[in-house]
Amino acid sequence: GIEQPDFFNAPPLARNPRDFWGRRWNLWFTQTTHRLIFQPLGGVQRPVFAASGVFVFSALMHEYMVMVSLGRFDGRMIVFFLLHGVATILFTVFSKSLGQTISLPRPVAVSIHFVWFIATAPLFFGPIDDIFALREWSWTLLFSVAMGWV
């Protein structure tokens, strides 16, 4: 048979946006968009342009799924993915300008990234909550599933 990659690699342990999106979250999607979007748009020769293309594609794809499900334009998915795209690109550009990846102690880096993710999570999980009409406990459940805790 065809070997399938793991979908997640301990997302709560991500140290930065690039680590989260490139090595820990939805690895099948990451590998697919790397091959079909990132590389054709210039890959490592044009990383800002190529990464922007991946995040714009992801934003539009997620927003389309929300729009079809809710029957209206929402916009939160677009904002979520554009914010995360900018954060990932800024982290990468800043690291390259230093000549190395920004290196903080693991607990500090993980905590900073976790706070960033929690701060932006309503933009991602809010539309999902609206689609499934989940209330009260839904944020905890959705976040726990997304983080691989359930």
What residue ranges belong to the model's regions?
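Interfacial helix-loop-helix junctions of multi-pass membrane proteins
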Residues: 66-77
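Alpha-helical transmembrane segments and their membrane-interface exit regions
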Residues: 82-91, 136-144
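Membrane-interfacial catalytic/cofactor-binding modules of polytopic membrane enzymes
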Residues: 1-67, 100-150
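Structural signal for the C-terminal ends of transmembrane alpha-helices
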Residues: 90-95, 125
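Short amphipathic alpha-helix initiation/capping segments at coil-to-helix junctions
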Residues: 75, 79-83, 104-108
